[in-house]
């Protein structure tokens, strides 16, 4: 792969050339020079071949000669042509640019039909010969050109004018000046009658309305961008701590959007109708003591927060005679709001929409992060193209400087990592240490799962656990302490293994913490659906599971606050005051991300038993963001080994989709299809399984009349038929596969384009060397011709004297 050319031409100039840009005549001379060179090359092919062969022999004999010649050895004509190339003259002549766009606006105005905006060629320096500027003997002054351009811009439509101003290779100040001048029309409106060049009242009114709507749209767009949550905070975090820490907060923002979507569906179709038609309470409302905020029991039990509060009857129509003696049946001719069916369908549809959104987000993130295979040239792009010239405020410019500096640190650290390989002995020693540490971490995860199982069995067999409400917090507290302490133990063990890449270190820590969380959650799922269902026969076990998940979620938040207080704040104070060190703790990305995934998994597990649990998760995420942001800025330092987190968002979404969401979906499917609901509470109290609510609804529809006879057919052939489920799953997998193939194809195309750019660079070097060789041959021919002419013009007397001598 050839590197892009980067050199500076030292072109000899005459005193009259200084301070002047290239004129159309100079450009014409350049074109004529290239045409003459091509003709000379076609006429002297044989001589050129001999010269190339001789040059190849010289190159073979000398090992110090390279392909590209230094510019100090180029001839004056070659350097002048190189300096006049289009790539070297971009933006050199402002007057020529204005003339170019003036002629373009004239052509646009003279057309009968308005062209498409996509047909404009946004070339920075097109050939001025196309506009017949060299035929004008007296060039217009820059101010006259600008005034003509303003007049022509005023005659264009607003969209065309903005598009053309956007494409001009001028500075932002000049573009603003042209836009302000073109917004005040002083001539005759195009296509509008008028006398003496004065616009009519309708034209002025229409122009004012267009400007007002345009300004209103820009203001609304700026307001929407300003209303984006945590916009400035995320920029500040990314500038000070890099993309690795920023990926955690972006992932938290994504989880907030998922929970908001889930809560919207549950409120609209489950909690809203139930609040509108509240059931009768079984007894007097219990008194709230304040402990309910931690336990979720007490006065929260008989509310819309839990499964047991929802009725198993219709909500918007009086009942006729029961169909089976226990189920409320609507009268003939009506289609009531069936609460059991609405409860089950809403949970299923919300999970399906979450799955589609999650898969789409993961595929989009995968395409954005893995589309480009290599990062060659990214350093130059970051240096030359990262600055946003629209930034005018001092605080924003300082923040952008921090972002660019951190980005360069990450890129250089990644480049240095690729150029420092390990030896064979070092790799073997690293593999042995990795194996030992992995065994210890797996043993720790297995021990935590066994401890949770033993303690949960003890809680089931303990008689005082059912009588005291505070005892219900013991199991969540034990699980939370294990989730908090085990990652620290794994982090201590990870200090023994020498990781070259900080990215690999984070990925390994994420895998170990994920195994720990999965082991604990698997044990808890068996505890809830395998043990608690049998122990709580005759009671509302769904409410207990919902309260248990609420307690786990609240306890996880409390322990997170304590960990932030003692793990970051206290450690910083001790390090600075007692140990006299300036080192602050680093932000543990792996542990904090797995805490977010763990909390979101608890939310998905509890949606069926506590529909209001996503609201609790939203409040928790909001508090976590502000607590973590404050602690990060005050107590943490940037990573000592900067690294580029280009794929972290994709990895986080993948972990959220497959282990977390898929596990929660399997848990809920087992509860819907296999577990018998409680007979004393909830919308499915009279059914053997929750899934039978659909069949009961079909029987009600058949009794409701012929107007809705097609709905039982839809349920029978689309909902109960497993072929439809497999078909939808196959289509989803096919879409994912096609998206992956499209991304791979785009990567191949990008690689081919990069290779083509590299080949074009080599072609330029080859053509410049050929040009130099042609000029060298031409200079030698001129010198030999001059020598022959001098010999022929010598006096005959001198020749006679030489012969006599």
From Swiss-Prot:
Q: How does it sit in the membrane?
A: Multi-pass membrane protein
Keyword Membrane assigned:
yes
Where is this gene product found?
A: Endoplasmic reticulum membrane; Golgi apparatus membrane; Nucleus membrane
Q: In which tissues is it expressed?
A: Expressed in placenta, prostate, testis, activated T-lymphocytes and lymphokine-activated killer (LAK) lymphocytes.
Which stretches of sequence are listed as region Disordered? 1-29, 778-805
Q: Give the transmembrane ranges.
A: 210-230, 250-270, 339-359, 432-452, 470-490, 506-526, 554-574, 605-625, 651-671, 723-743
Listed GO CC annotations: cytoplasm; endoplasmic reticulum; endoplasmic reticulum membrane; extracellular exosome; Golgi apparatus; Golgi membrane; nuclear membrane; plasma membrane
Q: What is its main location?
A: endoplasmic reticulum
Example GO molecular function term? mechanosensitive monoatomic ion channel activity
Carbohydrate attachment residues: 103, 312
Q: Which InterPro entries match?
A: TMC, TMC_dom
Omega-N-methylarginine PTM positions read 94
Q: Which UniProt keywords apply?
A: Endoplasmic reticulum, Glycoprotein, Golgi apparatus, Membrane, Methylation, Nucleus, Phosphoprotein, Transmembrane, Transmembrane helix
Q: Does the keyword Lyase apply?
A: no
On this chain, the residues bearing Phosphothreonine are 89, 105
Could you list which ranges are Lumenal topological domains?
1-209, 271-338, 453-469, 527-553, 626-650, 744-805
Q: Which residues lie on this side of the membrane: Cytoplasmic?
A: 231-249, 360-431, 491-505, 575-604, 672-722
Query: Pfam families given for it?
Result: TMC
GO BP term, example: intracellular zinc ion homeostasis
Q: How does it assemble?
A: Interacts with TMC8. Interacts and forms a complex with TMC8 and CIB1; the interaction stabilizes each component of the complex. Interacts and forms a complex with TMC8 and SLC30A1/ZNT1; the interaction regulates zinc transport into the ER.
Q: Which disease is it linked to?
A: Epidermodysplasia verruciformis 1: A form of epidermodysplasia verruciformis, a rare genodermatosis associated with a high risk of skin carcinoma that results from an abnormal susceptibility to infection by specific human papillomaviruses, including the oncogenic HPV5. Infection leads to the early development of disseminated flat wart-like and pityriasis versicolor-like skin lesions. Cutaneous Bowen's carcinomas in situ and invasive squamous cell carcinomas develop in about half of the patients, mainly on sun-exposed skin areas. EV1 inheritance is autosomal recessive.
Q: What does this protein do?
A: Acts as a regulatory protein involved in the regulation of numerous cellular processes. Together with its homolog TMC8/EVER2, forms a complex with CIB1 in lymphocytes and keratynocytes where TMC6 and TMC8 stabilize CIB1 and reciprocally. Together with TMC8, also forms a complex with and activates zinc transporter ZNT1 at the ER membrane of keratynocytes, thereby facilitating zinc uptake into the ER. Down-regulates the activity of transcription factors induced by zinc and cytokines.
The entry's family comment says: Belongs to the TMC family.
What is the recorded name of this protein? Transmembrane channel-like protein 6
């Amino acid at each position: 792969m050839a590197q892009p050319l980067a050199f500076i031409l030292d072109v000899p100039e005459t005193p009259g050339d200084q301070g002047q840009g290239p004129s159309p005549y100079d450009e014409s001379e350049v074109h004529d020079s290239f045409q003459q060179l091509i003709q000379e090359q076609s006429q002297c092919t044989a001589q050129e071949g001999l010269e190339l062969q001789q040059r190849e022999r010289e190159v073979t004999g000398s090992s110090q000669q390279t392909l590209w010649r230094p510019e100090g050895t180029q001839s004056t004509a070659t350097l002048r042509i190189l300096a006049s190339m289009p790539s070297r003259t971009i933006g050199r002549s402002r007057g020529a640019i204005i003339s170019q766009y003036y002629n373009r606006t004239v052509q646009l105005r003279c057309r009968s039909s308005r062209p498409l905006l996509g047909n404009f060629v946004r070339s920075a320096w097109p050939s001025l010969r196309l506009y017949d500027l060299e035929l004008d003997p007296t060039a217009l002054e820059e101010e006259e050109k600008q005034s003509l351009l303003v007049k022509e811009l005023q005659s264009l439509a607003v969209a065309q004018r903005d598009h053309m101003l956007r494409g001009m290779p001028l500075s932002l100040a000049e573009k603003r000046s042209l836009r302000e001048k073109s917004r005040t029309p002083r001539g005759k409106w195009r296509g509008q009658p008028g006398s003496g060049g004065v616009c009519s009242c309708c034209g002025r009114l229409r122009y004012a309305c267009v400007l007002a709507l345009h300004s209103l749209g820009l203001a609304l767009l700026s307001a929407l961008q300003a209303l984006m949550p945590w916009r400035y905070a995320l920029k500040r975090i990314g500038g000070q701590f890099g993309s690795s820490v920023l990926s955690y907060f972006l992932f938290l923002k994504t989880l907030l959007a998922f929970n908001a979507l889930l809560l919207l569906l549950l409120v609209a179709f489950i909690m809203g109708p139930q609040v509108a038609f509240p059931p009768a309470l079984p007894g007097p409302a219990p008194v709230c003591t304040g402990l309910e905020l931690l336990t979720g029991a007490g006065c929260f039990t008989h509310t819309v927060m839990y499964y047991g509060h929802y009725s198993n009857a219709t909500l918007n129509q009086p009942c006729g005679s029961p169909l089976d003696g226990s189920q409320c049946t609507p009268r003939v001719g009506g289609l009531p709001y069936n609460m059991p069916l609405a409860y089950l369908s809403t949970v299923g549809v919300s999970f399906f929409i979450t799955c589609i959104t999650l898969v789409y987000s993961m595929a989009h993130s995968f395409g954005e992060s893995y589309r480009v295979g290599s990062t060659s040239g990214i350093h130059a792009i970051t240096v030359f193209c990262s600055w946003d010239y629209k930034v005018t405020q001092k605080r924003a410019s300082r923040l952008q400087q921090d972002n660019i500096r951190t980005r360069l640190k990450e890129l250089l650290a990644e480049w240095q990592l690729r150029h420092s390989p390990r030896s064979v002995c070092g790799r073997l020693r690293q593999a042995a240490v990795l194996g030992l540490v992995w065994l210890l971490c797996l043993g720790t995860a297995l021990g935590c799962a066994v401890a949770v199982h033993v303690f949960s069995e003890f809680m089931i067999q303990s008689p005082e656990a059912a009588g005291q409400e505070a005892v219900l917090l013991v199991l969540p507290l034990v699980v939370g302490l294990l989730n908090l302490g085990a990652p620290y133990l794994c982090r201590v063990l990870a200090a023994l293994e020498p990781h070259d890449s900080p990215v690999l270190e984070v990925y390994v820590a994420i895998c170990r913490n994920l195994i720990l969380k999965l082991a604990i959650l698997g044990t808890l799922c068996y505890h809830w659906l395998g043990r608690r269902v049998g122990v709580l026969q005759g009671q509302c076990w769904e409410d207990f599971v919902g309260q248990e998940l609420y307690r786990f979620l609240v306890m996880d938040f409390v322990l997170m606050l304590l960990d932030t207080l003692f793990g970051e704040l206290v450690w910083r104070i001790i390090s600075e005051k007692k140990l006299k060190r300036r080192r602050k703790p680093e932000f543990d990305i792996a542990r904090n991300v797995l805490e977010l995934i763990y909390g979101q998994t608890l939310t998905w597990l509890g949606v069926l038993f506590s529909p209001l649990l996503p609201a609790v998760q939203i409040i928790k995420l909001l508090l976590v963001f502000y607590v973590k942001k404050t602690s990060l800025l005050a107590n943490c330092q940037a990573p000592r080994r900067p690294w580029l987190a280009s794929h972290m968002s994709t990895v986080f979404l993948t972990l959220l989709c497959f282990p977390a969401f898929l596990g929660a979906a399997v848990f809920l499917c087992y509860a819907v299809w296999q577990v018998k609901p409680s007979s004393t509470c909830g919308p499915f109290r009279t059914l053997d399984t929750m899934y039978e609510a659909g069949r009961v609804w079909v029987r009600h529809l058949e009794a409701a009349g012929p107007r809705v006879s097609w709905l039982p057919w839809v349920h029978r052939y689309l909902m109960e038929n497993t072929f439809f489920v497999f078909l939808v799953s196959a289509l989803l997998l096919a879409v994912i596969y096609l998206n992956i193939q499209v991304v791979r194809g785009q990567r191949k195309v990008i690689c081919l384009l990069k290779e083509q750019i590299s080949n074009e660079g080599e072609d330029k070097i080859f053509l410049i060397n050929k040009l130099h060789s042609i000029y060298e041959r031409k200079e030698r021919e001129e010198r030999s011709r001059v020598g022959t002419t001098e010999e022929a013009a010598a006096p005959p007397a001198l020749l006679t004297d030489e012969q006599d001598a």
